[in-house]
Amino acid sequence: KALVLGSGGASATVCAVLNELRARSVTVISRSGEDNYGNLDRHADAEIIVNTTPVGMYPNCGVSPVDLRQFPRLAGVLDIVYNPARTALVMQAETLGIPYMSGLYMLVAQAKRTAEVFEGHAILGSETERIWKKLGREMQNIVLIGMPGSGKSTVAARLAEALDRVALDSDAEIEERNGASCASLIERNGEAAFRALESEVIADLGRRSGMVIATGGGCVTREENYASLHQNGVIFWLRRDLDKLPREGRPLSAGDLAAMYDKRRACYERFADHSINNNGTVEETLRQIMAALPEEE
């Protein structure tokens, strides 16, 4: 049983394909039709959900058309939105362990078929896969997390230079927007107020694509920041021995660093896709990160 969210042109195409694939039933969910978002309970046995609405699309990231927990038999989710790479719907599927797919592959396949029609010749099917992977690499953000002073800003700048990307720094952005240093903002307003500012900035930076993003050491203490960074990014945890972390100009590092690390360690582990040893040279760190990134074909 398949549910198709939305009743526009893309919905008609998806319904045609599902029927061609002999889905047992295909139901269109719209805002005002007989089957709508107010009576989704009647479709709790849905096994496939396809979102054809723009809900969750850039720049309005972070919202989802439905709560997947309403569908205990769900076996697959497709969201035709391709920006961000992982919509809120897709990320919930990921969290629940439900197989999912975003809309980028569909976009590339559609472009391939369009090119064939206009150019009058066939294009190898393998080109769809190649271009899909290439676009995925180019659009993906590379995000750096880690303790204060672990080298995130330095590594981000060098990595961006090596990959011909733009480096963004959440702390620098906070300071530019507020006309004050992060240290003074924390001392003046307290850590909780600073974290709220930080989450706003991270939400903005995370919506962008193809960037290298250095984050503040404490951003992992707010779970909402994970979705902002994960939606378009691969996240690297830069690890550096505590005795090598600088403290000057960092009010939150002035106390017990070991206690801070113990408190945050599980958060770093939760956020990170990869863990990188940053006790050596910047070049060694760059090599580790580059080795973890998908290779070009």
Where are these regions (language model features)?
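NAD(P)-binding Rossmann-fold cofactor-contacting core
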Residues: 20-37, 171-178
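NTP-dependent small-molecule kinase module
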Residues: 129-137, 142, 158, 162, ...
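ATP-dependent small-molecule kinase phosphotransfer cores
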Residues: 169-230, 262
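Rossmann-like adenosine-cofactor binding region
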Residues: 35-100, 219-225
